[in-house]
Amino acid sequence: MELPQPRPFKTQGRKPTHDFLSLCSHSTVHPDPKPTPPPSSQGSHLKTHDFLQPLECVGAKEDVSRINSTTTASEKPPPPAPPPPLQHVLPGGIGTYTISPIPYFHHHHQRIPKPELSPPMMFNANERNVLDENSNSNCSSYAAASSGFTLWDESASGKKGQTRKENSVGERVNMRADVAATVGQWPVAERRSQSLTNNHMSGFSSLSSSQGSVLKSQSFMDMIRSAKGSSQEDDLDDEEDFIMKKESSSTSQSHRVDLRVKADVRGSPNDQKLNTPRSKHSATEQRRRSKINDRFQMLRQLIPNSDQKRDKASFLLEVIEYIQFLQEKADKYVTSYQGWNHEPAKLLNWQSNNNQQLVPEGVAFAPKLEEEKNNIPVSVLATAQGVVIDHPTTATTSPFPLSIQSNSFFSPVIAGNPVPQFHARVASSEAVEPSPSSRSQKEEEDEEVLEGNIRISSVYSQGLVKTLREALENSGVDLTKASISVEIELAKQSSSSSFKDHEVREPVSRTRNDNVKQTRKPKRLKTGQ
């Protein structure tokens, strides 16, 4: 049965069947630009014979046409091969390499340097099968400036399986060599010897003509170029990622080794004392504990009825309670004064002295207390505005001329403890007699405390009386027939307590300055013996 035949591209008589089959046979292999002319000896009576004829000789025609097409495609782009003994200089001027043909391949091959992938080398599956069986192609690639020159080649069809194994082995060795060249671990001579040994062992290791292998070699070239500082960036395949991960793992391992070494050096016996916590039995810790124990022992001696067997927390609580008790006891005597301040810097110690000498009465005297003002805080002076201790003049109190300045009357020797926050102090006596016993003075002090008046420090009183007696004796006054009376006012301004020469000042309560406001009713104390 004869199939309907379409018109050929060019009408050539009465042979449409032969033209149709010849076009189909050529279209399966490679589209030829020049169609094959049909034989002229075929006539209309050979239609069945023409239909079966391509089935008999299509194999030979396909082989010849495909070999011719691949040969022309491979021979068009590359330049002519250099002579065999010619030496080439490696990129960067590192060394030279020589390409020499193998004896049993010189009549088939042409060396085609292929730095980049060219479009004519892309084949489909049928063409790759034909090339694996009937042709041997050479493919060479240049590595970067630091890598050597490596050739890949395919062997004959009889050594097909062995060639692919050698190709995989050689490719792995070359990949390792390229990676090592990138890291900088192998010298150039060793890489060259490695590549030459690989070529000597496997001849020319054949590279598979599949697209994946070509892309792998191209991506390795790009990786080496990027390691050398070029700006070209291409996508890397899975095997490159694996190699880069392996390199990063080796780099991280080297960093770990460095860190371990540094940690070992840092943990040397010399610096071990600084890093480790202080030992319980060290000499420094023992000294610190002994100091703490000594100070706790001092506290236990100060606090009455303290238990030696109590722990430190309970003992500190007992100390706090005792301090609070002392503060309450101190506040009991000074709550009537507004100048009481709880700040530790302004709290002044006070120590009463029982050996107190009384000032004799008979002389009205109001000195200027400059030294006392320097020793008493301002807050204490501010609250002493209304505190006035006045002594009325008696019959024995007679004025007498004294040409003595206030500074020469007394230079109070305040030794020992400074003047505290007690605001008024008076020491008076009616006659110059030996000081009474300490028991009577203690009783008198207790009475004054109950009345709200507190005596001044005996040290200051003794200095004042001594200076006054010396001044009176120098002026010719008989102290055995005279009585001395002393008035002291503590206020902000010292002008109200200034001394007037050649006259005896009236009581301060009568001649108080108008600018000093009286905060409360003044208390007067009359003392005498």
UniProtKB/Swiss-Prot annotation:
UniProt GO molecular function: DNA binding; DNA-binding transcription factor activity; identical protein binding; protein dimerization activity
Entries under SUPFAM superfamilies matching the protein: HLH, helix-loop-helix DNA-binding domain
Inducing stimuli: Repressed by cold treatment.
Gene symbol of the encoding locus: BIM1
Listed Basic and acidic residues bias regions: 255-265, 282-291, 499-517
Endoplasmic reticulum listed as a keyword: no
Pfam families from the UniProt entry: HLH (PF00010)
Low complexity: bias regions: 426-438
Biased composition range(s): Pro residues: 76-86
InterPro entries found in the cross-reference section: bHLH_dom, BIM1/2/3, HLH_DNA-bd_sf
Role played: Positive brassinosteroid-signaling protein. Transcription factor that bind specifically to the DNA sequence 5'-CANNTG-3'(E box). Can bind individually to the promoter as a homodimer or synergistically as a heterodimer with BZR2/BES1. Does not itself activate transcription but enhances BZR2/BES1-mediated target gene activation.
Compartments, record wording: Nucleus
Bias-annotated ranges (Basic residues): 518-529
Oligomer status and interactors: Homodimer. Interacts with BZR2/BES1 through both C-terminal and bHLH domains. Also interacts with LHW.
Tissue specificity as recorded in UniProt: Expressed constitutively in roots.
A GO-annotated cellular component: nucleus
UniProt keyword annotations, A-Z: DNA-binding, Nucleus, Transcription, Transcription regulation
Disulfides per UniProt: none
The protein, known as: Transcription factor BIM1
Every bHLH domain range: 276-326
Region (Disordered): 1-91, 245-291, 425-450, 491-529
